[in-house]
């Protein structure tokens, strides 16, 4: 869990308390893959590892779109589903993205 007390960290904690199935969320710097703010509700979920890994995933998405002749920054959201969770990523301009992980009992709406 994040020990920081920034307003963004507080906002992520509020979101965690109100979102059924919440596991983790982070706002991540695309350049270095480090979370600028994060909150993990599930002790087994480490958002710092996920932030680094999914930064590469989002960069790969941008590269693929560029190769296809599409605008690499035209992605609204990226949704990844597994047997146990949903992960939703939203790019926040060029430099950051927001990622959230929810159990399948949760609701992304």
Where are these regions (language model features)?
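Acidic, low-complexity cytosolic segments
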Residues: 1-23, 31-109
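N-terminal glycine-rich anion-binding loops that anchor highly charged ligand groups
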Residues: 28
